[in-house]
């Protein structure tokens, strides 16, 4: 007989809710464990089977840690601002707040149906004014520290959506959402000075228990490089521009310069003959995203401006070009080109037939670029020096002649923080008619997002908030000065930068988080989520955390001690699940047909947690069959406990049980859930063969399966006679001495070739091993003379016979 999952799951979910089984007390003598999930964006589509994979992993850890005597913080909430809700509101005329609330309720019910042990009293929602009051408070702190500033920035403007898009929201020059054309235009934007924290964001990665591949992604994104700035005068004018280079030693090899098409000097220096070509090129570039412009594989394009720069080191005149591979937002927006010794410059020079000049020996620049080290040539005072010596000497020369200076730059850009949308946190700043701006006073927070029927983009580049006169227009009560509120809102990243802190103290109206509580819970012990957030979300959260550390709000330098990215669950055809492909699996259907415990077990058993694996109905059925086998082993058809369960010990199961406790405990801790489940399957097979089942082993097994399949775990626990939940029962322990193998497998070789394998006592003497081995290979050595027998105790016997 199999168990009735619908009945059991409903029963125990009701019990947990009623008894607040997973409430986390703040005051406790127990050691702490903080297990964090990347909270979801509550979309209209609801939960998909990819969500529970990470959630089940943290839930297994949380449930085991509670049984091991830890005070566990395991919360859930909603990252609920953002573009999709606003787009839905635009498409349907409904309010994004109602849409969001409806979606959250759906998500919450779906998540509860999967039996996760969240403390729902700590639920947070980024769109709740009591929450975003503190998001705004953090913004005020950034503003006070000079880390939030306004700048004119070329942005990705999408006329159809009426908003600015991040590079990540653009695919092939069109918006990811809706496929609308995108163009570049300068706009007044709020920026956060994340570059001020570049070194710390880089250095502190070393202290974290994160996958090395993920640390490398962050290192590359920050992209620290050391080099020099060099100033170039423009021939025949008073103008100059600055380039950053990691190879100042190759300055003698510069043969042309390239400016970004958006560079401020372009219009000024372009000659009349080149004006038309330059303007046409600039218009074409406006349609491209930064990502497309800097792709290594693409064909190089560019236009000559007609102007020349003067090389400070030798007075040579270098033609100035514009090209889209140089970005105004990266470095200084200008480069000196040394085609003999730089890949991209070489490609560009080859396309436009520009001169090349060798200044480092070691290659043949008539055939290909040479980027290696070597003795410098054609470089006056650098001749004969290697790369490092030449860099140091050139920087010395640049600084002595005021032609440049040593410089460290980052690939990391300051964070474009404003969005021209309605559905986001209002930025708490007022712009006054006299040109000044002030922050909203702390005591006036939260600055609440006004309700409005019309959330269409204003079309001017401002957000829909610009249309709400009574909200936008303000008067200073003291001076009578008129002002306008900031109409930009914060990006969706803002609320997710610090949510892990609010879980610690979710209802505090006086402070972001209580200092004692935050000291108790930080850092987060494990953070599990998808790899798509490996760079931006984690970088932004680390940045805000460091600012909060500097102002004394948090006691740790880093927020997340250990981090793990789960893999992706693909459709049965090995493709990414998507509505358009019709291969999405809805967890609600599985919970109805197979049960939440089966879904949890299957997702953990599919393969390693970090692998991407295809969904399989057969695998799902197999997971259910295993749970049915467990049930039938312990429970009779009449619902009573199996008569095989006794208080007497059973020697034949002893080793298998202790092995299982050891392996499951270690594998859960190391997130190797698939191999832990395999071991439990082995134990169940052994238990079916056994005459009797010691009660101690049955209870231990139920405790081990409960974190994966908590409903069946609770039901079996109550059948074992316990009135209390299994949640806080103590985790089983194993005895090392019971794991020792009494017997070993010995390999028997003849002339170095394996001819037999024997099982014998691990303490067998050399003589016994030799005797047993010779008996086993009698037919192999018949008629031969045994010349020598080599015995390696506990391992092998090699017979030399001919």
From Swiss-Prot:
Its EC number is 6.1.1.4. Its main location: cytoplasm. One of its GO terms (molecular function) is leucine-tRNA ligase activity. One of its GO terms (biological process) is leucyl-tRNA aminoacylation. ATP binds at residue 579. It is an enzyme of class 6 (ligase). It catalyses: tRNA(Leu) + L-leucine + ATP = L-leucyl-tRNA(Leu) + AMP + diphosphate. A motif ('HIGH' region) lies at residues 40-51. InterPro entries: aa-tRNA-synth_I_CS, aa-tRNA-synth_Ia, Leu-tRNA-ligase, Leu_tRNA-synth_edit, M/V/L/I-tRNA-synth_anticd-bd, Methionyl/Leucyl_tRNA_Synth, Rossmann-like_a/b/a_fold, tRNAsynth_Ia_anticodon-bd. It is found in: Cytoplasm. Keywords: Aminoacyl-tRNA synthetase, ATP-binding, Cytoplasm, Ligase, Nucleotide-binding, Protein biosynthesis. A motif ('KMSKS' region) lies at residues 576-580. PROSITE patterns: AA_TRNA_LIGASE_I. GO terms for cellular component: cytosol. The keyword Nucleotide-binding applies. Belongs to the class-I aminoacyl-tRNA synthetase family. NCBIfam families: leuS_bact. This is Leucine--tRNA ligase. It comes from Bacillus cereus (strain B4264). The lineage of its organism: Bacteria, Bacillati, Bacillota, Bacilli, Bacillales.
């Amino acid at each position: 007989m199999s168990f009735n999952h619908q009945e059991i799951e409903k029963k125990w979910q009701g019990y947990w809710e009623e008894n607040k089984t997973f409430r986390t007390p703040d005051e406790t003598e127990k050691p702490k464990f903080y297990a964090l999930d990347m909270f979801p964006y509550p979309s209209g589509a609801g939960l998909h089977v990819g969500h529970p994979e990470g959630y089940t992993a943290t839930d297994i850890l949380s449930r085991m840690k509670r049984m091991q005597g830890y005070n566990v913080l395991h919360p859930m909430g909603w990252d609920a601002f953002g573009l999709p809700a606003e787009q839905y509101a635009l498409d349907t005329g409904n309010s994004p707040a109602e849409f969001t609330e409806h979606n959250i309720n759906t998500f919450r019910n779906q998540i509860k149906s999967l039996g996760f042990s969240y403390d729902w009293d700590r639920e947070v929602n980024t769109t709740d004014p009591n929450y975003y009051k503190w998001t705004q408070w953090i913004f005020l702190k950034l503003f006070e520290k000079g880390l939030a500033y306004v700048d004119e920035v070329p942005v990705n403007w999408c006329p159809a959506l009426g908003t600015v898009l991040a590079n990540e929201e653009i695919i092939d020059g069109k918006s990811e959402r809706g496929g609308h054309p995108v163009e570049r235009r300068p706009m007044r934007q709020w920026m956060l000075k994340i570059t001020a924290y570049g070194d710390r964001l880089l250095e502190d990665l070393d202290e974290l228990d994160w996958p090395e591949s993920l640390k490398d992604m962050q290192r590359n994104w920050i992209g620290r490089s050391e080099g020099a700035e060099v100033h170039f005068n423009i021939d025949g004018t008073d103008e100059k521009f600055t380039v950053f280079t990691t190879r100042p030693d190759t300055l003698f090899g510069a043969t042309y310069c390239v400016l970004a098409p958006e560079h401020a000097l372009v219009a000024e220096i372009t000659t009349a003959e080149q004006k038309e070509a330059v303007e046409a090129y600039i218009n074409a570039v406006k349609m491209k995203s930064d990502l497309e412009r800097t792709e290594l594989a693409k064909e190089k394009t560019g236009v000559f401006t007609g102007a020349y720069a003067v090389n400070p080191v030798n007075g040579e005149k270098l033609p100035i070009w514009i090209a889209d591979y140089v970005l105004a937002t990266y470095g200084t927006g200008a480069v000196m080109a040394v085609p003999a010794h730089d890949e991209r410059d070489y490609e560009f020079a080859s396309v436009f037939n520009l001169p090349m000049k060798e200044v480092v020996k070691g290659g043949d620049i008539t055939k290909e670029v040479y980027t290696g080290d070597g003795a410098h040539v054609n470089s006056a005072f650098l001749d004969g020096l290697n790369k490092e010596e030449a860099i140091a000497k050139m920087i010395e020369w640049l600084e002595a002649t005021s032609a440049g200076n040593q410089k460290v730059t980052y690939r990391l850009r300051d964070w474009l923080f404003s969005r021209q949308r309605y559905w986001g946190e209002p930025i708490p700043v007022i712009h006054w008619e006299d040109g000044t701006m002030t922050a909203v006073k702390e005591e006036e927070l939260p600055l609440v997002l006004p309700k409005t029927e019309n959330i269409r983009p204003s079309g001017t580049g401002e957000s829909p908030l610009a249309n709400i006169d009574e909200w936008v227009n303000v008067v200073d009560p003291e001076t009578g000065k008129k002002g306008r509120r900031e109409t930009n809102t914060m990006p969706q990243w803002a609320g997710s930068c610090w949510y892990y802190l609010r879980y610690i103290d979710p209802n505090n109206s006086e402070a972001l988080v209580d200092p004692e509580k935050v000291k108790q819970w930080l850092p987060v012990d494990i953070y599990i989520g998808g790899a798509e957030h490996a760079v931006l979300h984690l970088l932004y959260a680390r940045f805000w955390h460091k600012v909060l550390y500097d102002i004394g709000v948090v006691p740790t330098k880093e927020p997340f001690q250990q981090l793990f990215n789960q893999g992706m669950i693909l459709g049965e055809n090995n493709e990414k699940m998507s509505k358009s492909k019709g291969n999405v699996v809805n967890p609600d259907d599985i919970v109805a047909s197979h049960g939440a415990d089966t879904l949890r077990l299957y997702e953990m058993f599919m393969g390693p947690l970090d692998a991407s694996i295809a969904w399989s109905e057969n695998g799902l059925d197999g997971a259910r069959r295993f749970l049915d086998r467990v049930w039938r082993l312990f429970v009779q058809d009449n619902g009573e406990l199996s008569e095989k369960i006794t208080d007497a010990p059973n020697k034949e199961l002893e080793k298998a049980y202790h092995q299982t406790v050891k392996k499951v405990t270690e594998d859960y801790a190391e997130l190797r859930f698939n191999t832990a489940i395999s071991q439990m399957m082995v134990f169940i097979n052994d238990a079916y063969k056994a005459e009797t089942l010691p009660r101690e082993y049955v209870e231990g097994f139920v405790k081990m399966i409960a974190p994966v399949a908590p409903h069946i775990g609770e039901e079996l626990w109550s059948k074992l006679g316990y009135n209390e939940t299994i949640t806080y029962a103590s985790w089983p322990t194993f005895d090392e001495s019971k794991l020792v193998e009494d017997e070993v497998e010995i390999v028997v070789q003849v002339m170095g070739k394996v001819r037999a394998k024997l099982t014998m006592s691990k303490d067998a003497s050399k003589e016994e091993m030799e005797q047993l081995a010779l008996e086993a290979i009698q037919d192999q050595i018949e008629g031969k003379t045994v010349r020598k027998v080599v015995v390696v105790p506990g391992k092998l016997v090699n017979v030399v016979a001919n």
